């Protein structure tokens, strides 16, 4: 009987020891998993400053009405010096969030420029007045940009209307105006608009002609890393840091 009891006791002790070992191992594994989970979600987001293309010292981004909420401080921390915001279209559409975005961009110490989208079906007077009425003096520091697509300059009249819009805004604000467009459209406008500089839409930074004040080199560039990474059209200023600082 004693022998049977000893066998039973030893078996029980073995099972108990095995169970305790299993539980201990399980607790250790759970502890490791829990520690990793806490570290993963609590660790700071690391932002990596994006490089500026060789030969340039200033770069920025552009946003429009379809852009989601933008963390301007994150942009500033990633070698972004300026931002262009789409404000008006023709004489019928205004980005209602522009002035709020302008305020936040200034708080992040970014220089700001506005984008007006040209509509050839509307007179230059109507478009300029719509811009003046809605944007007012909140035009930022950078030249006013007029976005032009190929379908809006198909006639001589549409080109002349654009030229008139440029001059009207320059006269009203005593402020530079540039045309935001592609090399092909720039060529088509060369005989009509001769003294206005351009913001060229490209996929590289090769055309550093003095007529190109800005060059958009990537329309979907990744800025930052991790949870704060964002893709935006990215542009370089075709000049020196000192020349850029003139815009105040």
Regions found by a protein language model. Name each.
Residues 21-43:
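Hydrophobic membrane-insertion alpha-helices, especially the h-region
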Residues 46-48, 53-68, 87-164, 171-172:
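Substrate-binding cleft of extracellular glycoside hydrolase catalytic domains
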């Amino acid at each position: 009987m004693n022998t049977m009891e000893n066998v039973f006791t030893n078996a029980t002790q073995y099972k108990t020891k095995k169970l305790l070992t299993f539980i201990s191992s399980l607790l250790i594994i759970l502890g490791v998993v829990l520690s990793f989970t806490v570290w993963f979600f609590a660790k700071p987001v690391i932002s990596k400053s994006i490089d500026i293309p060789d030969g340039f010292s200033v770069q920025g981004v552009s946003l429009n009405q379809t852009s989601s909420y933008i963390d301007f401080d994150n942009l500033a921390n990633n070698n972004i010096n300026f931002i262009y915001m789409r404000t008006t279209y023709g004489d019928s559409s205004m980005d209602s969030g522009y002035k709020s975005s302008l305020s936040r961009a200034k708080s992040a110490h970014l220089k700001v420029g506005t984008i007006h989208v040209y509509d050839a079906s509307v007179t230059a007077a109507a478009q300029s007045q719509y811009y003046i009425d809605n944007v007012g003096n909140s035009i930022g520091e950078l030249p006013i940009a007029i976005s032009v697509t190929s379908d809006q300059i198909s006639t001589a009249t549409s080109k002349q209307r654009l030229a008139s819009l440029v001059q009207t805004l320059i006269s009203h604000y005593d402020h530079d105006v540039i045309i935001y467009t592609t090399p092909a459209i720039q060529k088509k406008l060369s005989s009509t608009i001769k003294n206005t500089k351009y913001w060229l839409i490209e996929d590289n930074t090769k055309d550093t002609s003095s007529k190109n004040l800005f060059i958009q080199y990537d329309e979907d560039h990744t800025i930052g890393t991790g949870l704060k990474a964002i893709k935006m059209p990215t542009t370089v200023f075709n000049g020196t840091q000192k020349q850029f600082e003139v815009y105040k």
